[in-house]
Amino acid sequence: WLFGHTMETRLYTLPLNIILYMIASIAGVVLVHIALDNISKFIKEGLMKDRFNFENESFEQCEEKVENEYSVNIPMRYYYKGKFRKGWISVSNCFRGTWVVGTPGSGKTFSIIEPFIRQHSAKGFAMVVYDYKFPTLATKLYYHYKKNEKLGRVPQGCKFNMINFVDVEYSRRVNPIQAKYINNLAAASETAETLLESLQKGKKEGGGGSDQFFQTSAVNFLAACIYFFVNYEREPYDANGKPLYAERQQDPQTKFWKPTGIVRDREGGNIVEPAYWLGKYSDMPHILSFLNESYQTIFEVLETDNEVAPLLGPFQTAFKNKAMEQLEGMIGTLRVYTSRLATKESYWIFHRDGDDFDLKVSDPKNPSYLLIANDPEMESIIGALNALILNRLVTRVNTGQG
């Protein structure tokens, strides 16, 4: 109906009202586009002027410096609305962890790592810095240490220590294989696993259950050796490193003399509490040398410790059955990898008599800066040695012992 008249007119079988509706719809769409085009002429913000962001414009960033006693504040510049502006990257809670990702040469050290070192040193933090390309970070860390020590910002008694397996003349010595760092068999197993995984860095995963069996066997055997040497003929020491006297009694099973738990001062004979215990051969050089002994000698020595005896079951069975191929598969893998660690530098740094500092770097009574140096050309060897130190250090700090 249109003005009271029926619309019976048709055009190619289409009613006239449908045709008028289509014409009106098309005209409406055209008019809307014309209106939007006219509106865009009044917008002066340059809409779609740089649709592919060739100017590298970013979003509006934080321009307020949020600072507290733990924060790290990194200045920055960003481009927004046609001009460069200044802002701040404020890491208010560093204890949550900060993950820095970037390609080589992208400026990670300059933009993130160095501000962390500079500001944490000024705020009196103890630090552990892993210098991947020594001395890139070593010189900066030592500079800020001396600067803030002069200004009185470094905690009193804080020392600067360095571990360097390449230029040992710069290095101090430390012994991570001792009872104060490895106090049970689980800690020995974790240490052994960390060391072997670091030596096998870059090896492709896979190989089935047989490879996993030999890998686990190597870890268990190394853990047994570590724990044996940590506890073999342990002697007590006081906080100053002076030896104390431990009363002993004979074990009826092994016929060995073992401590009773009573410790006395050598001078006055008074009962005292030792600061730590140290095995007679408790260090990495003795363990590496021990692994090169004959199987019979190794088993005869390790069997004297009842705590490590359960780990030796598969090895002793293979040895008694003269399954030398299986035994070589279980222990030979360990010997091949650990033989690469037997260098004069590692023997000197890890020797029992050269424990120059404690890995409790965050101890309020004895804080320190520790720089661990690395050389990319010898990373496969040095990285494993450094991993051994870091494993014991991180475990000690995270358990509240540091």
Which residues does each PLM region occupy?
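Basic- and hydrophobic-enriched, low-structure N-terminal and domain-boundary segments
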Residues: 1-106, 110-115, 123
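P-loop NTPase motor domains
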Residues: 44-48, 91-402
